[in-house]
């Protein structure tokens, strides 16, 4: 109190600074003690005994300093890895015990012990005590042992070891069922205790693993019950084996086993699936081959079953049997008639001869020779296709009977162009045109012949037979001068006394 007394009555900055230094020294001393304790605890060599629970010690060591340490996540990951390493050491020890027990059970010494030793019921108490102890230890440590806190590089290795351990555990369960049948006649006490301890180690490991289902744990209890039951019958052994098989089949639902399943569980199913997948293309090939054979073989003219008769026409020869709406058999003709017309086929249309359809006319067959049909020739299909296409084209052309239109190249053109005849000179009767209509020379002199007009007139008024007539294309230059009119009265060539042109040379078939 004498240190704080001057502060209350005579405050001064010197005393205030001194008190501050004292408080700082006390704080540094306290923190130094905590750091020393931490360093001493870290300098201790950890005991890697697999029976010790190191994750609890590491957790207690770093839980207080987790918030102030920069690499707290890495330390947490390291703690989980150390714990997993110890758990795998424990698993290896369990597997060694189980293998030694299996070797002993297969030896002739074990059969002699089973034949001589009396029954022993001391396993019940040890099993129940060990189970209660391990269950209490599980409640303290927690069941979330294998969480996803591993590094990404080690995930595949961990999954592989889990699947291997799981398959080994299932094999150990089978050996435990065999061991139960041996215990029916009796084992020595030291062997029974070792068997129970190793079997209980299996029990705690299966409870701690999250990738094992509850079905496997229940099956493990059934193994314990068969282990404790001392009936000498062989039926218990078979029941235990069936229980292990059911546990092996139910454990395939776990996610880790889906990623990397054990070979003892998934191989039969995978073989079955592969065989089914291989059978599918084989079935497709069989179907395709049968379809090719059915298409290659022509349909028979008669039915395979002569006892069947048509319910309408009572015939027994038909290329195809059909059915009416009531389910009665119909021949091909009656069935098609009913399908197309909706009524039954009259008996007056019945014929005993099956007519074949004429797919091409006789003219086309005479003109075009079909190629030789050979099923062995690979190019026969292409030739047959070309043949049918040519037959169809020629048949279509003959049925339409189309006359191609006349082109300008097909029309005979005169060497000397002649003018077209005016409308008032045309007549429907054959006669000599005289001086009934006066025509001046200027009409023809100013007129220029147009080839298009000439062809149009000829096509419109004359038939095609008149094109070959010499009088139709008689030249007009002898009577008409296209350049200048002849007004000389002394020239009487093709003129009348009145001075009109005489058109007697026009012998047109108009």
Curated annotation (Swiss-Prot):
It comes from the Eukaryota. The modification Phosphoserine is found at residues 167, 262, 270, 399, 418. A zinc finger (GATA-type) spans 310-334. Pfam families: GATA (PF00320), GATA_AreA (PF08550). The keyword Acyltransferase does not apply. Keywords: DNA-binding, Metal-binding, Nucleus, Phosphoprotein, Transcription, Transcription regulation, Zinc, Zinc-finger. PROSITE patterns: GATA_ZN_FINGER_1, GATA_ZN_FINGER_2. Disulfide bonds: none annotated. Positive regulator of multiple nitrogen catabolic genes. This is Transcriptional regulatory protein GAT1. It comes from Saccharomyces cerevisiae (strain ATCC 204508 / S288c) (Baker's yeast). The lineage of its organism: Eukaryota, Fungi, Dikarya, Ascomycota, Saccharomycotina.
């Amino acid at each position: 109190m004498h240190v704080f007394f001057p502060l209350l009555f005579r405050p001064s900055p010197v005393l205030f600074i001194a008190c501050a230094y004292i408080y700082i020294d006390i704080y540094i001393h306290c923190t130094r003690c905590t750091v020393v304790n931490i360093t001493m605890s870290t300098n201790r060599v950890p005991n890697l005994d697999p029976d010790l629970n190191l994750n609890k010690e590491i957790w207690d060591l770093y839980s207080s300093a987790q918030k102030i340490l920069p690499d707290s996540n890495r330390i947490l990951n390291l703690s989980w890895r150390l714990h997993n390493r110890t758990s795998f050491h424990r698993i290896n020890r369990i597997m060694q015990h189980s293998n030694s027990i299996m070797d002993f059970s297969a030896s002739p010494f074990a059969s002699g012990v089973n034949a001589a030793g009396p029954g022993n019921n001391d396993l019940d108490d040890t099993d129940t005590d060990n189970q209660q102890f391990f269950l209490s230890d599980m409640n303290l440590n927690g069941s979330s042992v294998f969480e996803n806190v591993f590094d990404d590089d080690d995930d595949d290795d961990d999954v592989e070891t889990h699947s291997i351990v799981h398959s080994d555990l299932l094999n150990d369960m089978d050996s435990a069922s065999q061991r139960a049948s041996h215990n029916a006649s009796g084992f020595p006490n030291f062997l029974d205790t070792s068997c129970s301890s190793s079997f209980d180690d299996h029990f705690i490991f299966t409870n701690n693993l999250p990738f094992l289902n509850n079905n496997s744990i229940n099956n493990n209890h059934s193994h314990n019950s068969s282990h404790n039951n001392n009936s000498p019958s062989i039926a218990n052994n078979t029941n235990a084996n069936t229980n292990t098989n059911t546990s092996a089949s139910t454990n395939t639902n776990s996610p880790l086993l889906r990623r990397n399943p054990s070979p003892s569980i998934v191989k039969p199913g995978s073989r079955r699936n592969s065989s089914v997948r291989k059978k599918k293309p084989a079935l497709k090939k069989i179907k395709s081959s049968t379809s090719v054979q059915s298409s290659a073989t022509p349909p028979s003219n008669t039915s395979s079953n002569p006892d069947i008769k048509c319910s309408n026409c009572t015939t027994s020869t038909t290329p195809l049997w059909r059915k009416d709406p009531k389910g009665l058999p119909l021949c091909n003709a009656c069935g098609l008639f009913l399908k197309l017309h909706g009524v039954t086929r009259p008996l007056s249309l019945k014929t005993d001869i099956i007519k074949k359809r004429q797919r091409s006319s006789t003219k086309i067959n005479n003109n075009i020779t079909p190629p030789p049909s050979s099923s062995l020739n690979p190019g026969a299909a292409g030739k047959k296709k070309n043949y049918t296409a040519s037959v169809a084209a020629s048949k279509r052309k003959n049925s339409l009977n189309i006359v191609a239109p006349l082109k300008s190249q097909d029309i005979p053109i005169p060497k000397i162009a002649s003018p077209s005849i005016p409308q008032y000179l045309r007549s429907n009767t054959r006669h000599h045109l005289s001086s009934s209509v006066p025509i001046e020379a200027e009409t023809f002199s100013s007129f220029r012949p147009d080839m298009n007009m000439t062809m149009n007139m000829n096509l419109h008024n004359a038939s095609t037979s008149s094109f070959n007539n010499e009088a139709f294309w008689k030249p007009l230059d002898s009577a008409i001068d296209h350049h200048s009119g002849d007004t000389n009265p002394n020239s009487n060539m093709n003129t009348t006394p009145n001075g009109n042109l005489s058109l007697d040379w026009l012998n047109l078939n108009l």
